[in-house]
From Swiss-Prot:
Stated name of the protein: dCTP deaminase
Keyword Nucleotide-binding: yes
Residues bound to dCTP: 109-114, 154, 168, 178
GO biological process, one term: dUTP biosynthetic process
Associated pathway: Pyrimidine metabolism; dUMP biosynthesis; dUMP from dCTP (dUTP route): step 1/2
Pfam family, one: DCD
Length: 188
């Protein structure tokens, strides 16, 4: 399994729509960086957030109550305030179409990690298609700003030695084609 370089990421995005919109260069002046890097792509967080609150005493991933989260539109302010010790969901600006022989792993940006803001995203499986739902945790005792339309995490692409027999699309993955923030789902 090989780690893919900027030239491959660029080719796959421009010729095959792997990342859309695609920024061919790293943008980093006066913003948290995003765009193409040497061996990855820095994704941007959109302006819509879902803040988990304390309306209900329990979070159940098998039976998630949407009333446990409040939608917040940060497009006007350009940032979202994540309360101390709080959790929110967001989504990428970029839409992904993964090749059948490639898996992507997403890692939080050090700019946020050094402020106690942890970003988690599960792997992008072969032939996954959609916007990426991003999990954001504020591990500090202070409120924290998360900047809309700026970098939030880096994606690295790993190409398999051979094509998988069954992709995420082939399995009918429950998050296939997701648009916007997608709450937890259980197949029934």
């Amino acid at each position: 399994m090989g780690l893919k370089a900027d030239s491959w990421i660029k080719k796959m995005s421009l010729e095959h729509g792997m990342i859309n919109p695609f920024c061919e260069k790293q943008v980093g002046k006066n913003v948290i960086s995003y765009g193409l890097s040497s061996y990855g792509y820095d994704i941007r967080v959109g302006s819509e957030f879902m803040l988990f609150d304390n309306k209900n005493a329990l979070i159940d991933p098998k039976n998630f109550d949407p009333n446990n989260a409040t939608k917040i539109d940060a497009s006007k302010e350009g940032f979202f305030i994540l309360p101390a010790n709080a959790f929110a969901l967001a989504h990428t600006i970029e839409y992904f179409k993964m090749p059948k022989d490639t898996l992507a792993i997403c890692l939080g940006k050090s700019t946020y990690a050094r402020c106690g803001i942890i970003v988690n995203v599960t792997p992008f499986e072969p032939e996954f298609e959609g916007y990426i739902t991003i999990e954001i945790s504020n591990t500090t005792n202070l409120p924290a700003k998360v900047y809309a339309n700026e970098g939030i995490a880096q994606v690295v692409f790993l190409q398999g030695d051979e094509v998988c027999e069954q992709s995420y699309k082939d399995r009918g993955g429950k998050y296939q084609g997701q648009v916007g923030i997608t709450l937890p789902k259980i197949l029934k």
